[in-house]
Amino acid sequence: AAGRIGHAYLFTGTRGTGKTTCAKIFAKAVNCLDTTSPDPCGKCEICKGIDSGSIMDIIEMDAASNNGVDDIRDLRDEVAYLPSVCKYKVYIIDEVHMLSTAAFNALLKTMEEPPEHVIFILATTEVQKVPVTILSRCQRYDFTRITADDIAKRLLYVAGEEKIDLDENAAQLIGRLADGAMRDALSILDTCAGVDNKVDEALVRRMAGVTDRGYLFEISDAINAHDSVTALEKIAELRQQSVDMRRLCMELAGHYRNLMLCA
C-alpha cells in the first residue's frame, strides 16, 4: 500500500456498522511491522499495542464531547510531532459532524497541508452536516446497514468463541432487532448471555421486550374480526409484561406486511 495512502478518510454510515472498528484496523494496516501483506498481522508489537490502546500514536477523539476550536487547535499543535513508534500517527475523530464551525475551520487548515506522517480518519453518522470543504479533502467510504443474516452468522461465530449456547432462531431474531448495527446485536447477545448461557428465542424476546408472535396473531385476528375488546385486552397484557408499545406498533406493521406477502 506504500505510496497509495491518503492523508484523510471519511467513514460514514449509520451507528454500529463498524466505522470506528475499521478505522482501528486501518491504523494497524498502515503501521503493521509485517509488510508482506496489506492486511495487519495482528501479532506484531504495533498491532497488539493498537488493540490494547497502549500505542500513543493512534489518537481517538470524540467530537461529541471535544467539539470546540481549542480542542482542534491542541490537535493541530500535536500533529507536528513525529510518531513515537509507528510509521504514521492516525487521528480517529468520531462523530466529526458535532464539531463547531470554528473547529471545522481549524481542522481544515491542518488538512490542507498535513504532515507526511499524519492520517486523519473522520467518522460520522450525519455526513450532510460535514462542510463541503472538509469532504473535498477526504476519501469517502460509505458503511451500509449489515443484513440480518450476516449479523446472525457473526453472532453464532462469536457465541462459539465465547462458549455461549446460542440458538440459530435466536441469532436470527437478534439480527432483525439490531436493524443493521452489529454493535447493537453484540450488546443484545451480551445482555442475554448475562442472564442465561443458553440463549434461545424466548429469552431474546423477553430481554429485548419483543412481542411473542402468538400475541401478534391474536391481536391481528381480533382486529380483523372487529373485536376491539379482545384486541385491547391482549395489548393490555403485553403492557403489563413491560413490552414497549412503540415496538409493538412496528411489529404489528411488520406482521401485517408478512401476511400480505403470504396472501
Indicate where each model-derived feature is located.
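Extended, largely alpha-helical regulatory/partner-binding modules appended to the mid-to-C-terminal parts
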Residues: 28, 52-56, 74, 87, ...
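P-loop/Walker A NTP-binding region and its immediately flanking N-terminal helices
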Residues: 1-140
